[in-house]
Amino acid sequence: MAVPANEDRPKVPESEKITINLGFVDLGQIDLLVSDGSRANRTDFIRTAIRNQLGRHDEVVRKAAARKQLDLGLRYFSRADLEALRDAGQTVNVHVLGLASIASDVSPQLALQTIESITVLGALHASPAVKAALGERIR
């Protein structure tokens, strides 16, 4: 039971930091294009390149997400959401392509009682205690 987009929830970052290794020549070519004004900086160049590649594979991504029954975008689980599930004797299997966020006031016990499994392709934001409690249920 995810919270609709218009309800209040904590602000989450719009991106996740990653580290990549590039060959010296590739990096030099990026720097050359940046210095010639093709892009504002390395990050802008790499983001654009990634978006272009994802755009070329959009159909494949959409079909795979549908086949794996992944929810696309942001899914936020508040304490009230999970308490309602618990009180109804229900659990949830979370399948997200994007960001799954569990409220900071959710206890590890409540998460264990209500989240049967969690699959996130992207990022999972939850307290360290909740992540540890759900450890074996995170795929």
Give the role of each language-model region.
Residues 55-88:
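Short, positively charged interaction helices/loops
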Residues 15-32:
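Short amphipathic alpha-helix starts
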Residues 88-105, 109:
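Long, contiguous alpha-helical segments
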Residues 128, 134-139:
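Compositionally biased, non-globular sequence tracts
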Residues 69, 74, 93, 99, ...:
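Detector for repetitive beta-architecture
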Residues 5-11, 28-32, 40-64:
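Short, basic amphipathic alpha-helical segments that act as recognition/interaction helices
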